[in-house]
């Protein structure tokens, strides 16, 4: 599967304690250059829990009732969680469902810079 930065995908996400995994949505944040040459990619998680949006840094709302939310391909309004940053083998990606808009990706980038101190 050819990945691009900003792709919304469903993948087998490992539990933080390493005991298993569950299919979850995520956003590809790795550069297109590296997505072309590597068998792994860097993603941030997406959660259905939106209660921290606007209250805590690192959470960006994806409202499925908006055109850009629909383009993301999610089933319900969700939050991108930039604290859920993972490097995963691309074999774990099960489905490509959409793309984040440039505006949402700019918000993700800003939160990643803040989280990583860049």
Give the residues covered by each predicted segment:
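Conserved functional hotspots at enzyme active or ligand-binding sites that engage polyanionic ligands
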Residues: 1-118
């Amino acid at each position: 599967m050819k990945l691009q930065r900003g792709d919304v995908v469903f993948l087998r996400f490992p539990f933080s304690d390493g005991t298993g995994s569950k299919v979850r949505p995520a956003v590809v944040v790795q550069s297109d250059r590296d997505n072309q040459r590597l068998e792994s990619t860097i993603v941030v998680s997406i959660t259905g829990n939106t209660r921290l949006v606007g209250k805590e840094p690192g959470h960006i709302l994806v409202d499925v009732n908006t055109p850009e939310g629909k383009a993301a391909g999610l089933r319900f309004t969700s939050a991108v969680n930039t604290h859920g940053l993972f490097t995963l083998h691309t074999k774990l990606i099960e489905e490509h469902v959409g793309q984040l808009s440039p505006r949402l990706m700019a918000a993700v980038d800003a939160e990643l810079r803040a989280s990583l101190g860049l």
